[in-house]
Amino acid sequence: MHGLKREFRIASRNRISKEIGALMGQGKKEEAEAKKAEVAAGAKRLAELEASETELQEKITKIMMVIPNIIDESVPIGKDDSQNVEIEKFGEPIVPDFEVPYHADILDRLNGLDKESAGRTSGNGFYYLMGDAARIHSAMISYARDFMIDKGFTYCIPPFMIRSSVVNGVMSFAEMEAMMYKIEGEDLYLIGTSEHSMIGKFKGQIVEEKSLPITMTSYSPCFRKEVGSHGIEERGVYRVHQFEKQEMVVLCKPEDSMDWYNKMWSYTVEFFRSLDVPV
């Protein structure tokens, strides 16, 4: 309704402006001045309608952003993580007869982790990965990349910054505020996961059905504020502001989505089993 009123006001203003020109040409100055006052009043009302329309559109967008994705009917419903249902597990964790050191302690013994220097250069939630630890990290990323390429996925290194229109297409405002770092003075955000820029690759595009499915695997550093209940891990490297990972992204027909979900799940399980890691 606001949009219709706005269009009507614009059309009315244009019509009256033409009338003013005609009246001035006829020497009818007083009538022209009255029309000018009418235009001024209309312009004020138009500005009010435009502000109202902007406010209303923002409210509509915020409501739309919290509408969740449609989930498969087989997915169990729960209030939080405590109600997750374990469907299957593979392998048995090895329980040693000694106290298992914390991963950060192991890295310290290997001279592979320097959080103190990172605290000076970047603040809490960052670290330097050094020596063999850094080499193992890079080797694991390469292994994950090649593993997915062998599954037929196309390897991609995406942009590490994306526009707000892409962010709004992949997460809610609340998630964006809790996760994303904004580049000051630019309409750009550092990605929290390469999924965001990979999905953004198809923003505003029409993908022909014959080209589906499109399967991609992407590597990227990831940047996250980690604002919320979990916060930043003080000692370890699990919950930090910067990390790297390999992702899977599939574009397919809606009716094929669950099949592809199961395939991607099986690839994840196979990956961990190839490393003898119980899952």
What do these predicted ranges mean?
Residues 1-93, 108, 112:
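N-terminal alpha-helical targeting/anchoring segments
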Residues 89-279:
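TRNA-recognition modules of translation machinery and tRNA-sensing kinases, especially anticodon-binding
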